[in-house]
Structure formats: C-alpha cells, structure tokens
C-alpha cells in the first residue's frame, strides 16, 4: 500500500485489476523499461550490486488449459489452433505460452521465473521469464550480472554441469555451485561441508521465492 501511495481507508486493487494493468504494460513494451528504471533508482540510492550473486528459478503455475487432443498437439508444436484464430474472444482467454514441467515429481503448468540477486542487499537484478519446461541452467548466461562488484556466483545443483562451469569461468566469475548427490558416488565430508556453507548464502534467494510461494502460489 505504501509503495502504491494508498491510504488505509482506500480500496486496494484486486489481483485481476493488477494483472490487467500489467498486461497493458506488456503490450506497450514497458515492462523491461520500468524494471531498468527501478534498477537505476536503486543504484542512485547507492544500492549497488555487490557481494557476488545468487541465481535460482521458481515455477509460477497458471490455471490449467482445457484443450482438446488436437489443440494440445498444435500447442506442443508452437502453433495456434485454427479454431482459436477464427474466434478472437476465446483466444484472448487462452494461455499459448505456458508449458508443463515436473517439480518434485508433480506436474506443473505455467512459467518459470529465473532471477539473480546480489548477496549484499538481496535485490533482483537481471531476470528472465520462460515457460516452465525450460531448464534452470539454460538461461544462466543471461542472468549473470556483469556489474556486480563481487566475482562469486552461488547456485543449486540444477546448474551443475561442465558447460555451466565453463560459462562462469569465461565470464570471469568464481563458481560456488552446490555439489549434486550421486547414488554411486557419495559426497565426501569436505563436499558436504562446502555445500553447507553454500546453503547459508543461498538462503537469501530462498527468502525471495518464499514470498512468491506464499503470496503468488509459486513452486
């Protein structure tokens, strides 16, 4: 309420109103411009990104689509069903960009928010939004903040691969990616200790996602 300049006695916009307003901003191509302005304002207030950065991703579910088998096949191919194109009103109520993914052995339909926060202040700096089927590691290169005054990067084991380590090295960052557990190759005592230390830092990004889960139904 304080952010919007609303008083205690004034009505608060409901979720639908906020969503419709955001859609208007999106259609006019203003989302990125507003976020960049917000980031500039943070820097002007001396909230420079520092201390390194933490990257992570969270699934944001949307209502499931009730589509026919033929419609699902078209959507899977990246096409809009012909019947929708002929009926603009139904099309406006269909989400043609969201996709399915698996999270903790449960199927989720929606999008995925990929973010990088600075360790010092915990503000979201670069971010990317994809459909839920995109793997966390696929957008790492776009998330790394070159303006962060720290060189260290923290991430969970979903980002653990030789190609990701190569990207981090090429961009001159220092990797603190969580060691993944392998059934045939258990972690050493040192690796477990390193993971505990990494988790203490990564807890900051979990707080950001915790808010999304509690307030917006993320996963």
Protein language model annotation of sequence segments:
Residues 72, 152, 157-219:
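Helix-centered, glycine/charged polyanion-binding patches within enzymatic domains
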Residues 1:
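DNA-recognition alpha helix
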């Amino acid at each position: 309420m304080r952010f919007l300049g609303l008083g205690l006695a004034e009505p608060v916009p409901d979720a639908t109103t906020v969503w419709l307003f955001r859609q208007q901003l999106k259609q006019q191509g203003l989302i990125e411009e507003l976020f960049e302005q917000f980031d500039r304002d943070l820097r002007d207030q001396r909230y420079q990104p520092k201390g390194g950065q933490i990257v992570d991703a969270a699934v944001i579910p949307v209502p499931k689509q009730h589509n026919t088998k033929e419609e699902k096949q078209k959507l899977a191919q990246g096409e809009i069903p012909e019947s929708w194109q002929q009926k603009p009103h139904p099309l406006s109520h269909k989400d043609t960009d969201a996709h399915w993914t698996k999270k903790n052995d449960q199927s989720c339909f929606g999008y995925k928010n990929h973010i990088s926060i600075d360790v010092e202040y915990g503000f979201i700096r670069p971010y990317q939004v994809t459909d839920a089927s995109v793997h966390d590691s696929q957008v790492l290169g776009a998330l790394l903040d070159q303006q962060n005054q720290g060189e260290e990067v923290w991430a969970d084991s979903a980002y653990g691969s030789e190609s990701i380590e190569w990207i981090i090295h090429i961009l001159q960052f220092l990797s603190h990616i969580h060691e993944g557990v392998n059934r045939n190759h258990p972690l050493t005592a040192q690796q477990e200790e390193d993971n505990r230390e990494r988790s203490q830092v990564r807890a900051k990004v979990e707080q950001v996602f915790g808010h999304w889960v509690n307030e917006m139904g993320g996963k």
